[in-house]
Amino acid sequence: MSPIGEPHSSTSKVRPAAAADRAWIAEFLHEHWGAAIVVVHGEVIEATQLPALVAEPRRGLASYRRLGDDAELVTLNAVPPSRGTGTALLEALTRQLGAEGCTRLWLTMTNGNLSALRFYLRRGFRLSQVRSGAVDQARRLKPSIPVIGEHGIPLHDELDLCRALGPDTPDGAAGPPWSRAHSDPSDGWWLSRAPVAGSDIAGSSDV
């Protein structure tokens, strides 16, 4: 994952992705994720099929999916980084989801994406759980997932983060939707065996 700096102010206009954006989204995902597929909590998804928000003029993308009353941020990227575009996308998405009645926004990231961890913790996310060895498992599905992350940190584990979208919403202590059907930590996975789509082990990079 690329480093994430603290953003400057942004005047980016954020809008829902349209059918005309499909080719650009595929190209953007290939540039930032190495493929149009992304992998997380043991599943592979065609990210171009997800709903998304676009920061004009096509300099940022946030893709997501609904999971009942919850939602998952799948990818978040901005070009160039550290200009506030990622923050603009994230805040636009949380406003939209809150207005739609969504209660929590989740994301998953690698243990070595320290810049992204700082970015999200400063924007209201809290750590919910760690899945030891989950990145090693995901690498079997997508071998291009890096072995080494920022600062030479080996990438082995997935971190789930949660942001409550309302003042009375529980903070996600029960774990993300994909883990609730199977929460035995003894196997190191802590995730549902039911098919669920997700992100490339990091709700974001380059924001």
Model-predicted segments: where are they?
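Conserved N-terminal entry element of GNAT/NAT acetyltransferase domains
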Residues: 1-20, 159, 165-195, 206-207
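Acetyl-CoA-dependent GNAT
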Residues: 16-83, 87-91, 96, 164-165, ...
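Conserved active-site alpha-helix within GNAT-family acetyltransferase domains
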Residues: 87, 112-150, 155
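Conserved GNAT acetyl-CoA-binding A-motif
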Residues: 97-111, 115
